[in-house]
Amino acid sequence: MSDEQQFSLFDASSEPAASPKSAKKTAKSVEPIAVEFERSQIPVTAKMPIPPGTYSDMNDMSAHCGECHRCELGSTRTNAVVSRGNPNADILIIVEGPGENEDLQGKPFVGKSGQLLDKILESVKLTEDDIFVCNIVKCRPPGNRKPSKDEMEACRPYLMEQIRLVNPKIIILTGASSIDGLFQEKSLGITKIRGQWRDWNGIACMPIFHPSYLLRNQSRDQGSQKWLTWQDIQEVRRMFDELKAAEAL
């Protein structure tokens, strides 16, 4: 089966509807940064914390990520992979470690898995304006292996700042590493927890299969991984509409 046929499972019945531009949202308020905090040391050592409110926007944070050596991945990367999408989006998607294409281009999910993710979102008429994509770690693990616990912990403060700045209504977690990294726990495995809403600091989180896993599992039959993902993304759309309607009241 060709990649195009794989993607076609999630083809929308019509062209995706353009969503209105999101109104500028305000990042969550934070306490003042402690006097002893040294911002210049953030990219140098994981021992230096990144207090909430350190960065004013994504560009500010990206500059630090580009020179970061908080873990050993900083010495093997080509580019730090920080984000893509609308920084004021209502849906934040956390993916696993960057792959080769992402490392070369400096953007998350630009390979075949990213193309499939875009198709999945388009199938329920979610547009680029509705989403913001980031990685659980910002640098590619050698050989595309899963990021280690220490690597995720070193990079976690960047992720926390991204969540604060975007202030999403929904978080989609693709794959087990994304879940483990956000919740700081060893999950039961994506097959057991996908499709079930979880709460993280008041934000609704939906675990789904990683698109690369879907590309390796071709069946579209009822109960297959692709079929289950279709159920999950429809549930995300339902929750998205429900939260938007409540906001409009």
Which residues make up each language-model segment?
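A polyanion-binding, active-site-adjacent surface
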Residues: S2-L249
